[in-house]
């Protein structure tokens, strides 16, 4: 069974036991339970597909926050020709890792 869930403006495919790397979720600590309720699609083990318009109200996905961490550094550069000017900046995006515990259809 798998589901497609929306979180942080993006859609992710999740299965029970998998780790989900999503945008940083403020207000939750490591070890807290999280309920993802914006479920777009669910495919059950017997092949049945449930599609929401836009979301499924009878499906909830629960998980546990594993960690808050930062991604690899991305370098952004600017070069102005004939002036000898160069600028390089770095950015590391925060993300939250969630372990999916259960996909429940009510």
Swiss-Prot record:
Cellular component terms (Gene Ontology): cytoplasm; ribonucleoprotein complex; ribosome
Pfam families: Ribosomal_L21p
A Gene Ontology biological process term: translation
Entry-linked SUPFAM superfamilies: L21p-like (SSF141091)
Coiled coil (residue ranges): none
InterPro entries given in the database record: bL21-like, bL21-like_sf, Ribosomal_bL21
Keyword entries, A-Z: Ribonucleoprotein, Ribosomal protein, RNA-binding, rRNA-binding
Domain of life where this protein originates: Bacteria
GO molecular function: rRNA binding; structural constituent of ribosome
Family in the record: Belongs to the bacterial ribosomal protein bL21 family.
NCBIfam families: L21
UniProt xrefs under HAMAP family: Ribosomal_bL21
Function of the molecule: This protein binds to 23S rRNA in the presence of protein L20.
Subunit note: Part of the 50S ribosomal subunit. Contacts protein L20.
Protein name, UniProt field: Large ribosomal subunit protein bL21
Organism field: Fervidobacterium nodosum (strain ATCC 35602 / DSM 5306 / Rt17-B1)
Lineage: Bacteria, Thermotogati, Thermotogota, Thermotogae, Thermotogales
Gene name for this UniProt entry: rplU
């Amino acid at each position: 069974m798998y589901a497609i869930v929306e979180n942080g403006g993006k859609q992710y495919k999740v299965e029970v036991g998998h780790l989900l790397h999503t945008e940083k979720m403020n207000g939750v600590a490591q070890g807290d339970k999280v309920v993802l309720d914006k479920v777009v699609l669910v495919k059950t083990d017997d092949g049945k597909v449930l599609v929401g318009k836009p979301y499924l109200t009878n499906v909830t996905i629960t998980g546990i926050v594993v960690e808050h961490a930062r991604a690899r550094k991305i370098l952004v550069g600017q070069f102005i020709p004939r002036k000898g000017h160069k600028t390089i900046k770095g950015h590391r995006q925060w993300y939250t890792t969630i372990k999916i515990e259960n996909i429940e259809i009510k």
